[in-house]
Amino acid sequence: MADQPNNAVNYPALAVPHIQLHGVVDDRMYDSFKQQLTGAPVEGPIVVSITTLGGDPEMARAMGDSIRLLRDYTGRETLFLGKVAVYSAGATFMASFPAGSRFLTRGTRLMVHERLMQSNIQLNGPLNTLSYTLKAKLNEIEDSIRIQDEGFADLVAGTRVMLDELKRKATSNWYIEAEDARDLGLVLDVI
């Protein structure tokens, strides 16, 4: 890493992110995100940094929706800066930023995987009603897959990664080093 050029000088806006997130993606991170977003400058680009080993993908999607709405309603530029580890729900959040607005610090790793589910199905009752329980669980699984695939499509939009490739690699936790992410177009640059 020491022999790499200092690309940070090309992106001075990334020096002090307006929103700095770290830890598990959960309700507390979402609350911190909303509070920091409220305190961010009202003009110019908004820079969001994150370091996370993952967490709740729905909280990541909620934060991402806030970023998307900010862009859509104000036209403001939003920049993503991943630091050290952007795993799981962190990559879900990263997908809410256009590929050309994403950056990673040197040595950072991304990790993308399929959504996980742990569930038990209790079948109890008249036989004619049991199929409804199974169908309800199947509907939940199928909708979760659709949500996952929408996020995967957002993550690879405008990159050199094909959606089918991402889906194939995500089955076994795809770890991507910062420089590889840049070369694949998943991020604009590494600083």
Give names to the regions the model predicted:
Residues M1-I191:
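Terminal-region recognition feature
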